[in-house]
Structure formats: C-alpha cells, structure tokens
Regions:
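Ubiquitin-like/PB1-type beta-grasp interaction modules and other compact soluble beta-rich domains
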Residues: 1-88
Length: 89
C-alpha cells in the first residue's frame, strides 16, 4: 500500500516536496511507521540526529484531520500528516 506522508513545520526539511511516499507491504501501526520514517532519514540524511528527534516528538494526523496515537493502524492507501512540535515543545 502507498502511504503519503504530508510534511508540516520542521518536517518540511525532509523533502523538497511537501510530502514523502512510502510503500508498505502490510498493515502498520504509527509506532512502526515512525521507525520506518527514521530509517529513511538515516539513509537520506546520513543519521541527522535533529531529524530523528523531530520524528520522535511529532504527532500524526489521519486523512480526516484527527490526531492519531501510536496504536493507530494504517491498513490501506492513505495520507498521514506529521505534525512536529512548535516553539520547542
């Protein structure tokens, strides 16, 4: 399935577009998707620790703009937004 990760705030530095696309073979919870994003950033940005911290501290939202928790399961093609903390916290 294709997950389009919409980038907001500081996460926009992850790409020259306003999104990243991930292709995942099976259902995935946000906590595991978060790890996939970090793995991608480790490769793309040679272990940029600040980017990892952004992902770890970020909230995620569903296509219908609801904040979702780490146990939320992505089970189909969908858009997910990553919302980094604002103002340092």
């Amino acid at each position: 399935m294709k997950i389009k990760l919409e980038l907001y705030g500081a996460s926009r530095d992850f790409s020259n577009k306003d999104y990243l696309e991930f292709y995942i073979k099976e259902k995935i919870e946000i906590k595991d998707f978060r790890k996939k994003i970090i793995d991608y950033l480790k490769i793309k940005f040679k272990g940029n620790n600040n980017f990892r911290k952004i992902v770890e501290a970020s909230a995620f939202c569903s296509e219908d703009n609801n904040i979702i928790n780490n146990n939320y399961k992505i089970s189909k093609d969908q858009k997910i937004g990553i919302i980094p903390p604002i103002g340092g916290g």
